[in-house]
Amino acid sequence: NDTRRMLDALRELHTRRFAVQPEAYIQSRIEQYEMAFRMQASVPDVTDMSGEPEHIFDLYGPDAKKPGSFAANCILARRLAEQNVKFIQLYHPGWDHHGALPREFTALSGEVDRGCGALITDLKQRGMLDDTLVVWGGEFGRTSYSQGKLTATNYGRDHHPRCFTVWMAG
């Protein structure tokens, strides 16, 4: 393909330069371009989850087949780890509960609990948890007192900068 031909031409130029000026950074640059190409070329295979068995989708929950859901992203994280990607970050938005805490917290924690639990189970069943570290964390916690109008269905909590959660598995 065109990308491969351009990369090969670039490799040839760098190799010629290295013959004249044998600097480590030139060889390093060649290796980095190759690694970037391999990573980009593997994206379609990694993101195609059509070959995942049904029991994996069942493990991760009802949103597992929905692209962009936390459950689908957890499956994608496992698939990236299988391809030896060294650092994978998942992000789950919507946790700034200054209001509607009872409804929002229940929904979001269900998504995260199911997805994270399934990811750890999946990694363990594949023997990958032995050399994979899962780190989950938030940048701040919540105060213990309510914020906003206090009703049974609509209240929130303010930020607590000295209280946060981090857990690890692996």
State what each model feature region is:
Residues 1-170:
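Ligand-binding pockets and gating/stacking loops
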